[in-house]
């Protein structure tokens, strides 16, 4: 039974927050932000641009719903309805995930309206458990687990992620 602690040193928005919320303890830097519990499906309609540039697209398909455009290159209402349904399903799953992982009711998650929150706001909404500087967090972890801590640091162009393990815990530190 491994306990997971996550430290957010920058931001954990949307999918990043979904991952952070699985932790038994979510700690955020005083300057950190979390949230954006929502779904966006960006769709770009190039029909007018194509028309101005003299581009006419032709699709040869099998299956009525294979291409989401009508003959003018605009999204069909059926396609838009399917995108909306898909977005709603993903949103409902996301809300349920956060509610379950954070132990808060679904309506409270829905009431966040996909906004982002500073550390203090997130704490008041129970989206996180505590606010600590990185130094305070390391002292907290050392106090909890003593010297029996091993770290693996992975760097990427997105920032740095430090994964620290003990005999019975996993600590994930997300930094920018």
Predicted regions span which residues?
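Small-residue-centered hinge/linker elements
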Residues: 1-2, 11, 17-101, 151-154, ...
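Glycine-rich beta-to-alpha transition loops that act as phosphate-gripper elements at the mouths
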Residues: 7-13, 111-115
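A mature extracytoplasmic/lumenal domain signature
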Residues: 8-12, 129, 135
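C-terminal intrinsically disordered, low-complexity extensions immediately downstream
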Residues: 135-155, 160
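Well-ordered beta-strand positions
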Residues: 24-25, 85, 114-115, 129-133
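Secondary-structure end/capping motifs
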Residues: 87, 91-121
